[in-house]
Design a protein with these regions (language model features):
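Carboxylate/His-rich catalytic cores and anion/metal-binding grooves
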Residues: 3-27, 69-97, 201
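Short, charged, low-complexity patches
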Residues: 6, 262, 387-400
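Short amphipathic C-terminal alpha-helix that caps PH/PH-like domains
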Residues: 9-13, 269, 394-402
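Amphipathic, well-packed alpha-helical segments that form the structural scaffold of globular domains
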Residues: 14, 18-21, 62, 66, ...
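Beta-lactam-recognizing serine transpeptidase/beta-lactamase-like catalytic domain environment
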Residues: 28-38, 78-129, 134-379, 384
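Conserved, well-ordered alpha-helix/loop/beta-strand core segments that scaffold catalytic motifs
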Residues: 31-71
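Short, well-ordered alpha-helical scaffold segments within catalytic/effector domains
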Residues: 54-58, 362, 396
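Short, gly/Ser/Thr-rich active-site loops of penicillin-recognizing serine hydrolases
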Residues: 286-290, 300, 394-407
Length: 407
């Protein structure tokens, strides 16, 4: 009664897990009676495969994501091991080992929440404001940008006749780069975009695995999309526009990332190392990304402020105790907001007033402990609103468990 791996790790390692059959060749007489053994090959048992996954963290993530579509990915910053890889909703893959019924298969295919999609490695989302970390780091690392430079956020920035709006209608007032990360001020990043070349930003983003494969050792990973000038010409037959850079620097527009990529982005920012994620246990060392340590430290401190200072967007999800968490919230917009809607007396339609499919995705990415990073975690909760409301609290509870038992 052999069973075969049909997806994921089990499919990739099926030959190792299965082993091989043995056999014996006999000489028999005319009656079929065995006279002697001629040749024999012993069966080879299947190998045990060790992974980095931690069952308790997997269970905790599934528990936290109950009733929520999305994904949770945790990477160990020391060895690149995937400690948690959860896609929600899921299904019982053991039902497939003996053949699934047509009724069950049709139900899975027709489920509007698509449980067959492994969102952790193949779900594609605009990263929203979590990507501002890369924009900010690129500005101070490669564009000689003064991190203390201030811009005034009135609630919008003009590019020609077009207005690009901040999420905060009344604006943030005067902010520097650290404030802009902490408060997630869109207008500050629009001003950065005025001075940025999209191709340079795109190339730097790939250092952090945005728009490129992570190298994880399981099949069916998608590489997402980091747009640039050549992509626009090739796929749209049009030249790149400056307004598209405005959208890109805040993680919107054409850009798409997987939850795994966002977790890996965070791990690489936290460590400054070219971490390569792995499900299968192996001992490895990672090369340096050669990013200026002072610039990385600036991003680290800004992420710390997001979670641990009163006006940070994730302050309500800060950790108590000695081990602190640094992070970045993101709200991934899935619809276009018209000028008429923005100028309504009541303002932009609230997320909860929209139909489910038009609501924003809630995103949070973080690492801990702050002074000695071990865990990098990304949470995406589809159509659940701002990153601070849903994804950040989920991440907090999962991180608390990881720090309490697996530090």
């Amino acid at each position: 009664n052999l069973k075969f791996g049909i997806s994921g790790i089990e499919k990739k390692l099926d030959s190792k897990l299965l082993g091989s059959d043995g056999w014996i060749k006999f000489e028999t007489n005319s009656k079929g009676e065995i006279k002697k053994e001629l040749k024999k090959k012993n069966a080879i048992p299947g190998s045990n495969i060790k992974t980095f996954l931690i069952g308790e963290l997997q269970n905790k993530a599934y528990q936290e994501m109950k009733g929520v579509s999305g994904a949770v990915v945790m990477i160990n910053c020391l060895d690149g091991g995937i400690n948690c890889l959860v896609s929600s909703p899921s299904f019982n893959n053991n039902e497939f080992s003996d053949g699934v019924s047509q009724e069950k298969w049709n139900a899975l295919l027709s489920d509007q929440y698509n449980p067959l999609l492994n969102r952790s490695i193949a779900g594609l989302y605009s990263p929203g404001s979590t990507y501002k970390l890369i924009t900010a780091l690129h500005a101070i690392e490669n564009e000689n940008f003064d991190r203390n430079r201030k811009f005034f956020c009135s609630g919008h920035v003009k590019l020609g006749k077009r207005k690009f709006h901040c999420w905060k209608k009344e604006g943030h007032g005067e902010v520097n780069l650290s404030d802009a990360i902490k408060k997630s001020c869109d207008c500050y990043f629009y001003n950065l975009a005025k001075e940025m070349e999209i191709d340079r930003l795109a190339n730097f983003s790939k250092v952090f695995s945005i728009g490129t494969s992570t190298g994880i050792d399981i099949p069916n990973e998608l590489s997402g999309l980091m747009p640039d000038r050549s992509w626009k010409v090739k796929n749209r037959g049009e030249k790149w526009q400056k307004g598209e850079t405005f959208n890109t620097v805040i993680g919107q527009g054409f850009m798409l990332s997987t939850p795994l990529q966002l977790s890996l982005m965070t791990a690489r920012i936290a460590t400054g190392k070219k971490i390569i994620p792995s499900i299968l246990f192996k001992k490895r060392k990672f090369e340096d990304l050669n990013i200026n340590k002072e610039n990385l430290s600036f991003i680290h401190k800004s992420m710390y402020a997001v979670v641990n200072q009163i006006n940070g967007t994730a302050f309500s999800s800060k950790l108590n105790g000695t081990n602190k968490m640094a992070g970045k919230t993101g709200t991934s917009q899935v619809r276009k907001i018209s000028l008429e809607e923005r100028e309504r007396e009541d303002g932009v339609i609230k997320n909860e007033q929209l139909v489910y499919k038009l609501r924003d995705h809630s995103i949070f990415t973080c690492y801990a402990p702050f002074h000695k990073p071990k865990f990098a975690l990304a949470v995406i909760a589809e159509h659940m609103g701002s990153g601070s409301k849903v994804a950040a609290p989920i991440a907090k509870r999962i991180m608390q468990l990881a720090l309490s038992k697996y530090l």
